[in-house]
């Protein structure tokens, strides 16, 4: 089997050209090396060939929001690992620890042309934990990672309200208050770390060792030796997880359907000077011009199917078009398992 693959005379659709065009595609070791109307030469002669004449050829799709690998296909409770219902604020959770590459949804994704997904916690929690970006093929999630921590999931609206009434989350006011409280505590925690002279580059183990003052002197750098341990705050996994958000290194990823929830997400992001991505954006067509002015990227969908709750009543395929026309940066998402990854065209 050759290291080269030639996809010959396919009708290519991409994100650059407005119209499809016919060309050859040369692939080397799984990566596209060259595209031209006709490719010739020794390498071409040695390549494995797929005759794509009359066949549409697309780049692999990237799904910016789903729960693939955390919500098993036809597994019921045994595979439901995308919502942690013990606490409404769980930033310390990491999606990569729950992804099951052996789940059937990965094969479905490949069948649908989806080659990379951003997958992570659901929307039960005010703060749900970090998403990860992974390839949709492989046996071990560590080898499939594109990026281990892409964004911090937060949620507004009906889902956190419905899940945590017994823990005092009855209203949208409470959802917003809990988010503000966590971000404020993270800012205070960060301030204390800076006051103690703590290097920002420390990983969690180094941080925990330093706070327990058990780091061996031979392990310390010059920067480590400048740390004032008497000023170090007690190690807090939740606050550690929120530091990249507060420092502008990781965006918030906000589940928001209703227009007022979208505005609340934007309001809080601007209050704390943090980055933001908006998911679902169901009422986006109603406020498209405003969203374009704000400039935060929006992920829309899935738009296919019945409105299963009140905040979905404006869902429809008109939404991404209206947002794009207004000038927003738009992606269309499956929210898998809501829409299976093998059917991205339905989103």
Region locations from a protein language model:
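Active-site environment of divalent metal-dependent phosphoester hydrolases
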Residues: 69-71, 101, 123-127, 259-263, ...
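His/Asp/Glu-enriched, well-ordered alpha-helical/loop segment
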Residues: 73-74, 80-85, 90-93, 251, ...
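Hydrophobic faces of well-ordered beta-strands that scaffold small-molecule active sites
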Residues: 62-64, 117, 152, 252-254, ...
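N-terminal metal-binding scaffold of metallo-dependent hydrolase/deaminase domains
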Residues: 1-44, 55
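Metal-associated gating/positioning segment near the N- to mid-region
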Residues: 55-121, 125-126
């Amino acid at each position: 089997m050759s290291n080269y693959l030639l996809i010959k005379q396919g009708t290519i659709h991409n994100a650059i050209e407005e119209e499809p065009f016919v060309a050859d595609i040369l692939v080397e070791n799984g990566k596209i090396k060259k595209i031209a109307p006709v490719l010739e030469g020794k390498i071409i002669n040695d390549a494995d060939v797929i005759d794509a004449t009359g066949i549409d050829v697309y780049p692999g799709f990237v799904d910016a929001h789903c729960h693939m690998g955390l919500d098993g296909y036809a597994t019921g409770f045994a595979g439901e690992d995308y919502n942690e219902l013990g606490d409404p604020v769980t930033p310390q959770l990491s999606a990569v620890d729950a992804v099951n590459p052996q789940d059937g949804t990965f094969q479905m994704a490949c069948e649908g042309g989806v080659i990379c997904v951003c997958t992570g916690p659901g929307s039960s929690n005010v703060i749900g934990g970090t998403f990860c970006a992974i390839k949709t093929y492989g046996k071990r999630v560590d080898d499939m990672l594109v990026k281990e921590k892409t964004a911090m999931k937060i949620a507004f609206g009906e889902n956190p309200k419905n899940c945590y009434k017994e823990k005092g989350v009855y209203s949208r006011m409470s959802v917003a208050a809990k988010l503000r409280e966590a971000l404020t505590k993270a800012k205070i925690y960060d301030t204390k770390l800076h006051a103690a002279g703590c290097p920002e580059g420390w990983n969690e183990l180094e941080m925990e060792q330093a706070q327990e003052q058990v780091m061996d002197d031979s392990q310390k750098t010059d920067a480590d030796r400048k740390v004032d341990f008497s000023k170090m705050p007690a190690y807090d996994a939740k606050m550690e997880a929120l530091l990249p958000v507060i420092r502008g290194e990781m965006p918030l990823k906000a589940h928001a359907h209703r227009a007022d929830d979208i505005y609340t997400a934007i309001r809080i992001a601007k209050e704390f000077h943090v980055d933001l991505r908006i998911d679902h954006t169901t009422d986006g067509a109603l406020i498209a011009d405003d969203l374009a002015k704000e400039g935060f990227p929006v992920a829309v969908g899935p738009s296919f199917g019945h409105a299963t709750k009140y905040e979905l009543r404006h869902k429809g395929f008109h939404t991404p078009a209206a947002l794009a026309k207004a000038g927003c940066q738009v992606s269309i998402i499956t929210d898998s398992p809501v829409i299976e990854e093998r059917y991205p065209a339905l989103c």
